[in-house]
């Protein structure tokens, strides 16, 4: 049960903000939030009244199974490598979730991965990642992870069998069995693709590198419990946020985002440039989220933001956007609390 009470004047003074309307304190499972004018706080962490800007992508979900959970994970990890951002990678990809043997077509443990990019590039990426990273991994099999897909990606791996391949049925699914050195590779050759959403994000500002990092890890762990999303960067965390272009090097398409670099806060101010680093902030980490739908990304952002705010030392949560020029999806931080 939620209980609400008006904040006392001393509480307002403690937070250093003038009155712009009603002040409320809401208590719920030891987590509290309140609104101060346009400022929001959750569990004592400032939540900036801004939004992340998402854009449409095509997403393929591939289920990878193996004789053990460990081998399925190794194959899934390989298949999602070099896929953090389409700024410099051919796609964005990550492990979505573990799937127990009772829920896979061949009754073996597995993982689902999401591969996200443009429609044309997606066909190439699914084929290349399955053929080079999963086919080559011991005991693996591949199945389509999308039901009711909008597009079909034919990966045609059976030709690798050089006419020694054969059609088989696995769990009621038509597949190919390709003979390989380690036995037989089972693959469902038609992988579905749907219209997904990329670009969900939020930034965690901490009073130390470790507080920000622990909060980022907590956020990623919480997001991992949400179906239909991935956090494509290493460990789900972005350490080197970038801006479009460069202030000093014309040949650079992207460069460090000095607004969010704590170590040069004073230098940025001295140059007359803007900084987004409040006093006392020592580190910033960003969480980027891609998903199969707008709803999935919203749920992931909410789970991640709230988890991050539960970590001591987190000062502020904000998000990155391009003023509506990047994409049609708006993920407001106020909806995360």
Q: What residue spans do the PLM features occupy?
A:
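Short hydrophobic alpha-helical segments enriched in small aliphatic residues
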Residues: 11, 16-18
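Conserved mixed alpha/beta catalytic, RNA-binding, or beta-rich assembly cores of soluble enzyme
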Residues: 40-49, 53-98, 113, 117-120, ...
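Glycine-rich phosphate/pyrophosphate-binding loop regions near the starts of catalytic domains
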Residues: 102-111
């Amino acid at each position: 049960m939620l209980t609400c009470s008006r904040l006392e004047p001393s509480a307002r003074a403690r937070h250093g903000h003038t009155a712009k309307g009603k002040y409320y304190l809401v208590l719920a499972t030891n987590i509290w939030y309140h609104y101060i004018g346009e400022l929001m706080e959750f569990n004592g962490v400032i939540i900036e009244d801004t939004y992340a800007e998402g854009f449409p992508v095509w997403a393929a979900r591939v289920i990878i199974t193996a004789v053990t959970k460990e081998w399925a994970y190794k194959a899934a990890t390989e298949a999602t490598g070099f896929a953090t951002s389409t700024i410099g990678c051919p796609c964005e990809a990550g492990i979505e979730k573990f799937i127990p043997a009772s829920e896979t077509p061949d009754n073996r443990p597995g993982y689902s991965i999401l591969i996200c990019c443009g429609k044309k590039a997606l066909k190439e990426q699914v084929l290349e990642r399955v053929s080079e990273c999963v086919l080559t991994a011991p005991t693996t099999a591949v199945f389509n992870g999308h039901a009711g897909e909008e597009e079909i990606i034919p990966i045609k791996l059976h030709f690798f069998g050089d006419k020694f391949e054969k059609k088989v049925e696995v769990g009621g699914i038509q597949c190919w069995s390709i003979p390989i050195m380690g036995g037989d590779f089972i693959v469902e050759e038609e992988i579905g693709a749907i219209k997904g959403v990329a670009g969900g994000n939020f930034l965690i500002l901490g009073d130390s590198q470790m507080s920000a990092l622990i909060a980022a890890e907590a956020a990623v762990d919480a997001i991992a419990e949400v179906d239909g999303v991935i956090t494509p960067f290493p460990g789900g965390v972005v350490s080197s946020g970038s801006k479009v272009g460069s202030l000093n090097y014309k040949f650079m398409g992207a460069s460090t985002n000095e607004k969010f670099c704590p170590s040069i806060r004073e230098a940025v101010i001295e140059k007359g440039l803007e900084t987004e680093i409040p006093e006392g902030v020592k580190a910033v980490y960003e969480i980027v989220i891609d998903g199969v739908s707008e709803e999935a990304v919203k749920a992931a952002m909410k789970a991640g933001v709230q988890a991050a705010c539960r970590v001591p030392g987190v000062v502020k949560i904000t998000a990155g956007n391009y003023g509506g020029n990047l994409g049609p999806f708006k993920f407001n931080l106020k909806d995360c609390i």
